[in-house]
Amino acid sequence: MPEGRRLRRALAIALLALVAVTGLLMMAKEQQMGQEISPFDGHSNLALAQAVARGDTQGIHAQATQDRLRERGDRQVTLLQWAVLSQQPDSVQALLDLGADPAAAGLDGNSALHTAAMLQDAQYLRLLLAKGAQVNVRNAVTGATPLAAAVLAGREEQLRMLLAAGADTTLSDRLGDTPLHLAAKINVPHLALLLLQAGADARARNQQGVAFQFYFSQTPAHLQNDELKAQFRELDKWLQGHRLATHYAQQ
């Protein structure tokens, strides 16, 4: 498969994952407004899921059993993911206290940690990390880590939190892409620099046999705004200082 086609396919997969999260966010908001819609419709834990979406911790404790906590909704979304997507921190904490597993695979193979890493509000990731969540848990389908999810969503704060919690910058997905490759594919040099400073391997190659610099080199300088150019200069400076500049050449 030509490299350009591979890149478009990888980005399409990432976009679909973000679209799925956005769709469930909208569904959660609708349920909070009293509309009867839930990915748990028809499931035995519907009442529990409704309590989760409302932030009703008493209802959560009254409804929770181990079987109900483990039962998934449509698209395999977990209750803990539903709490995150419903933006209910009290529900997240209540579910964690009841033993909900933040590493369990759910929506599109992601864990709750992946989901929290993608949201704008970082408090949900903070709650999961405070509970000792497995920071390097893999997506059950793609093999991607929460660090990769944060990169794809462009979440700098979550990326920093995951790095501080010990996230491994060198772990790749099933296509061989590390978070550094993904940062280059979506053209975010400032996130790439953070990963490099945290120990990411600049020479790592994916299944296509290319390092992250190849993807950055596909963005012509004349298409960059001033902010992006400044970020590229900082990245170049770091690479030159670590004798890696020959691996990266912009057109």
Which residues fall in each region the model found?
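Start-of-repeat signature of ankyrin repeats
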Residues: 44, 76, 109, 142-143, ...
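Ankyrin repeat boundary/linker residues
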Residues: 73, 106, 139-140, 173, ...
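N-terminal segments that cap or nucleate solenoid repeat domains
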Residues: 33-82
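N-terminal Sec-pathway targeting helices
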Residues: 2-18
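Ankyrin repeat structural motif
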Residues: 56-64, 88-96, 121-129, 155-163, ...
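Ankyrin repeat A-helix N-terminal signature
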Residues: 50-55, 82-88, 115-121, 149-155, ...
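Ankyrin-repeat-protein effector appendages
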Residues: 2, 23, 27-47, 198, ...
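Ankyrin-repeat inter-repeat connecting loop/turn
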Residues: 69-70, 102, 135, 169, ...
